[in-house]
């Protein structure tokens, strides 16, 4: 029995290594093809097609080739968001408008989890604006706020630090509780902060829990037919990314 168990574990480990290597090979091929198509579009003078292919290539690079990086700078995450929104704007034309507002350029040097914002924006497009008949807007905004920490062990000792607010909101159809297999309470039916079990949101919350413990907030407000607002509050953290992080 023990020999069989060891063999099965070794087999699983080998399969995992093979799958990892395969996952590394396929993206390189795809990006080479994209680069070739982009170049052909550029040479043919088709600037619109060139920009779309280039944006898609950059989006995929940000999602796949940097998968080992846990945290990146805000400006790098925003580049991924902008590439995604550019492509969706090309797809939906006048149906989609978007705004990205950053209170201070220094905020772009903060470190945040990789792919923290982009999946929320993707969710806003897919589940908020896509089902909507009329045109819609997505807003991404970020600002910092001073936060006073009190040390209970040392009387009257206080420390001022900064916290980062990240907001993604849309004026789409709102959250569909039936598809989420949720029965909203009376409070949830109003445009109040809600608890949720949506898989995408839950994955984001789990990631934040792992990286920040209890030192974060993840809030959602939604009203059917009017839209959804997501707010993430994190410690503001600037600096270079440590090696291997």
Question: What kind of feature is each model-predicted range?
Answer:
Residues 1-221, 229, 233:
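Two-component histidine phosphotransfer core
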Residues 222-245:
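C-terminal end segment of the histidine kinase catalytic
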């Amino acid at each position: 029995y023990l020999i069989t168990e060891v063999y099965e574990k070794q087999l699983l480990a080998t399969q995992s290594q093979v799958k990892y290597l395969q996952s590394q090979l396929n993206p390189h091929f795809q990006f080479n093809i994209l680069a070739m198509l982009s170049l052909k579009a550029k040479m043919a003078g088709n600037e619109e097609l060139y920009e779309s292919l280039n944006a898609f290539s950059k989006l995929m690079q940000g999602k796949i080739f940097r998968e080992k990086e846990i945290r990146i700078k805000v400006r790098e995450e925003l580049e991924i968001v902008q590439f995604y929104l550019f492509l969706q704007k090309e797809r939906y034309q006048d149906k989609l408008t978007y705004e990205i507002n950053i209170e201070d350029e220094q905020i772009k040097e903060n470190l945040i989890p990789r792919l923290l914002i982009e999946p929320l924006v993707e969710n806003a497009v897919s589940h908020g604006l896509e089902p909507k008949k009329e045109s819609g807007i997505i807003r991404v905004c970020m600002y910092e706020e001073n936060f006073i920490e009190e040390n209970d062990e040392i009387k009257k000792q206080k420390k001022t630090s900064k916290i980062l607010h990240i907001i993604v909101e849309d004026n789409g159809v709102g959250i569909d509780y039936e598809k989420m297999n949720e029965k909203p309470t009376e409070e949830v039916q109003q445009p109040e902060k809600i608890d949720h079990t949506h898989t995408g949101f839950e994955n984001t919350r789990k990631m934040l829990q792992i990286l920040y413990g209890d030192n974060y907030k993840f809030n959602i407000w939604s009203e059917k037919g009017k839209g959804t607002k997501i707010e993430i509050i994190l410690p503001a953290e600037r600096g270079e990314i440590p090696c291997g992080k």
